[in-house]
């Protein structure tokens, strides 16, 4: 059951990415009609370069934006030993361990691959969770590392950036350029305008969908590592019950945290990078029946 869930989640992510890439290519070719293919290729290269910078420096940026401080075993033996035991269990390299001095209970993982991984927990999380719950949360974060989720999110980020740049350039060309050249009928003009307005919104929704799928996958991977899904389910319930905004908020890294760090409200639900906590807990309890 658990292995089939993990396999299904990976397939879902692949299908979303595959359709997204095809859609981006189609939109790009349509945009090339107005921008010219050389300019279109320039925008793609620019977006790819931006994504590469994010890929190689995302770990450092996340640490800086969160205000996390690197620790050793002596600084917090409980957190360090938990991560070390999970590293041994999963066969992954020992990641750098950080603590964020913030009363909001939360945790995140970052790094482009297991060799460059970083995991962090807030002081608030360490205060409210017992040892088994802490292990469940950190197993979830190590699951992100094991599943190369930072790499997946970087690919999606690059595609979203490309769509945004292309859309912006197309809209500028439609508004200020001469679009009455041969072949650019009023109908094609309207079609390109429609997709230029719609594409960034659709791209963002795809990004959110991928993020939610990866959260489910990390939950399942973490549960499989500890063989105790109930601990992670209990931790998620505590995180939801004690949720509060982080002192240093950044929407650009909201998807990294195990629990949505943004303030509650209608738009948080609509554009959430995380699936509903109730559904995550339900799935974990269902997995628990397999042990």
UniProtKB/Swiss-Prot annotation:
Cofactor(s) it depends on: Zn(2+)
Domain of life according to the entry: Bacteria
Entry's cofactor comment: Binds 1 zinc ion per subunit.
Annotated InterPro entries: HtpX_protease, Pept_M48_protease_HtpX, Peptidase_M48
Any one GO molecular function term: zinc ion binding
Keywords: Cell membrane, Hydrolase, Membrane, Metal-binding, Metalloprotease, Protease, Transmembrane, Transmembrane helix, Zinc
Secretion signal, residue range per the UniProt entry: none
Predominant location category: membrane
UniProt cross-references to Pfam families, sorted A to Z: Peptidase_M48 (PF01435)
Membrane topology label: Multi-pass membrane protein
A GO BP entry: proteolysis
Family under the similarity heading: Belongs to the peptidase M48B family.
Protein name as it appears in the record: Protease HtpX homolog
Organism: Tropheryma whipplei (strain TW08/27)
Gene, per the UniProt record: htpX
């Amino acid at each position: 059951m658990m292995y089939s869930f993990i396999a299904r989640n990976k397939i879902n992510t692949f299908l979303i990415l595959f359709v997204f890439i095809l859609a981006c290519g189609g939109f790009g070719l349509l945009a090339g009609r107005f921008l010219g293919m050389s300019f279109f290729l320039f925008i793609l290269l620019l977006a790819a370069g931006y994504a590469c910078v994010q890929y190689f420096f995302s770990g450092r940026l996340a640490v800086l934006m969160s205000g996390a401080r690197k620790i050793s075993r002596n600084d917090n033996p409980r957190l360090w030993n938990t991560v070390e035991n999970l590293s041994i269990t999963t066969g992954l390299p020992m990641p750098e361990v950080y603590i964020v001095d913030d009363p909001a209970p939360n945790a995140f993982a970052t790094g482009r691959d297991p060799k460059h991984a970083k995991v962090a927990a807030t002081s608030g999380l360490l205060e409210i969770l017992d040892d088994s719950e802490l292990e469940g949360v950190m197993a979830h974060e190590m699951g992100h590392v094991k599943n190369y989720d930072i790499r997946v999110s970087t690919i999606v980020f690059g595609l979203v950036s490309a769509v945004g740049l292309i859309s912006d350039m197309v809209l500028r060309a439609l508004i200020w350029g001469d679009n009455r050249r041969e072949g650019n009928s009023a109908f094609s003009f309207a079609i390109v305008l429609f997709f230029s307005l719609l594409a960034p919104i659709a791209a963002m929704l795809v990004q959110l969908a991928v993020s939610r799928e990866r959260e489910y996958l990390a939950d399942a991977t973490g549960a499989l590592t500890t063989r105790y899904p109930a601990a992670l389910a209990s931790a998620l319930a505590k995180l939801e019950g004690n949720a509060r905004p982080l002192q240093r908020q950044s929407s650009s890294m909201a998807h990294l945290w195990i629990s949505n760090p943004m303030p509650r409200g209608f738009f948080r639900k609509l554009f959430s990078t995380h699936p509903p906590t109730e559904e995550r807990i339900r799935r974990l309890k269902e997995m628990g029946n397999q042990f």
